[in-house]
Swiss-Prot record:
The gene is cyp10. Keywords: Isomerase, Rotamase. This is Peptidyl-prolyl cis-trans isomerase-like 3. The keyword Isomerase applies. It comes from Aspergillus fumigatus (strain ATCC MYA-4609 / CBS 101355 / FGSC A1100 / Af293) (Neosartorya fumigata). PPIases accelerate the folding of proteins. It catalyzes the cis-trans isomerization of proline imidic peptide bonds in oligopeptides. Its EC number is 5.2.1.8.
Length: 212
């Protein structure tokens, strides 16, 4: 199953591991389908490690998002985003050694700690962390994340010869304003310094086994 992330720096063609991690894949595809990722930034980056995006609270999500049940209405999406299962937890789907952070271009969920198992988004949590809408893509193998984050896909175009070209390298080398914690400040119109905007413009779904 595949999608294309149309980014500010070109198209990332992504294969999803729907059979191995069905809940994670369904969550990602549903958020893609309703436009939740449209016009959202990549808000963290560490060249040589990873780039992170998918915070649906940061983008101008369309009104269609509130038709995705049990998703919250657009104006009630919590800071950091949430999964389609809200207020229930989207638990980790760890599969070792089959799915690991063992290469460049691995797509994985950015988890958050569970502080209160009765809180919205954490209800029914089975582990110390849960997933929401945020994800990251590795720039290199990151074995220290194995067992901690859910791998659910991989980027297919990783070289200049691949269809679409090596877009991940363009993102990694973009001229950005970044703080010590890797947080990206998107440039303002007319701002000096030549900084680039970086994010997801839209998503095309090529196959969705969960569509009804």
């Amino acid at each position: 199953m595949s999608v294309t992330l149309h980014t500010t720096h070109g198209d990332l063609k992504v294969e999803l591991f729907c059979e191995a991690v069905p809940q994670t894949a369904e969550n990602f595809l549903a958020l893609c389908a309703c436009g939740a990722y449209n016009n959202t930034p990549f808000h963290r980056i560490f060249p040589g490690f990873m780039i992170q995006g998918g915070d649906i609270s940061l983008g101008p999500a369309p009104g269609t998002l509130n038709t995705l049940k049990p998703m919250l209405p657009v104006n009630e999406i919590p800071k950091g985003g949430t999964s389609i299962y809200h207020p229930r937890a989207l638990n980790q789907e760890i599969h070792l050694p089959a799915l690991r952070h063992n290469a460049r271009g691995i797509l994985s969920m950015a988890s958050r700690p569970v502080k209160d198992r009765t809180a919205p988004g954490s209800q029914g949590a089975t582990g110390a962390t849960v997933n929401g809408s945020q994800f990251f893509i590795t720039f290199a193998a990151a074995p220290h994340l194995d067992g901690a984050s859910t791998v659910f896909g991989k980027v297919l175009n990783l070289s200049p010869q691949d269809e679409g070209g090596d877009v991940l390298s363009k993102l990694e080398k973009a001229k950005l304003k970044v703080d010590k914690k890797g947080r990206v400040t998107q440039p303002k119109e007319g701002e000096e310094g030549g900084y680039e905007a970086i994010g997801i413009n839209s998503v095309t779904i090529h196959a969705n086994p969960f569509a009804k």
